[in-house]
Amino acid sequence: MENIEEIFNEILVYDVQEALKYSSDGFKKSGNPEYLIYTAHGYLVQGFYEDAIAAVDLAFELGCDYFEYGYNVKGEALLNLGLYVESRRCFERVTKEEPEQYLANTFLIELDIRESLYEDAINKCVDYMENFECDNKQLSDLKCIIGWTYLVNLNNPEIAKEAFIESIEANENCGRSYTGLGVYEANYKRFEEAIEYFNKAIEINEDDGENYFGIAICNKELNNFDVVEEYLVKANALELEDNRIIEEYAFELLRQERNKDAIEYFKEVLRENPNNIEIKNLILELEKIDEI
């Protein structure tokens, strides 16, 4: 008998539509509701969260007992819809049956962070490392989460730095920990050191836009303006909805005296944050100058 999960996930790596076709055809031919769980996963990957939830619910109604996979998919879909209470219930359902289930535990940590329960998030990371066997990647990822929580949310950069270093010691390919160290160094105005960390992170994962943004900011502070726009463009291409990048790019265009282009990007910033009086006034001033 074929391993449905294994085949589905192998296809999913290369082609979401083919993976969905495999699960859909499998359900039509066999009536096996397990296929619906994987259909739900395919919907989740594409961002069709309501469809993912409906597919999981139907699978359970038809007798599928693959609760771990199903509730993890449903929980993630609910999380992406901002339904945190319902999402938490799904992941807690998984951990009640399998306390060591790593994915569900990491999503519960993510929920704590989103709901500003930062100490709870850190405690969950520590408890998991103390109570369950972790491979090096899991250990590194949990240390990385602790680092970012201390750095961004709890304003304790020194403990954050320690966590990032421990994360890298466990797994030298944890790009996000190098990014964290880059932010740490940049906050202390050690821009050359920060750039080194951001570049190391890019070597590991070239698709994390925060590293290009960090390099752009550091070069701006070092007055290396020749490369600032290049790195902001790269950052924006990867993080299209990050308003920090758009605003910084607008100011770079303004520095280059490309006022018309700058105005358009400032307006984009304003669409995301209409209460930004400073940007609103700046646009008005630039438009007046442009009329002269």
How would you name each of these model-derived features?
Residues F8, H41, E76, E110, ...:
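Residue-level recognition of tetratricopeptide repeat
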Residues P33-E34, F67-Y69, Y102-L103, N136-S140, ...:
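Helix-start (N-cap) detector for alpha-helical repeat units in TPR-like alpha-solenoids
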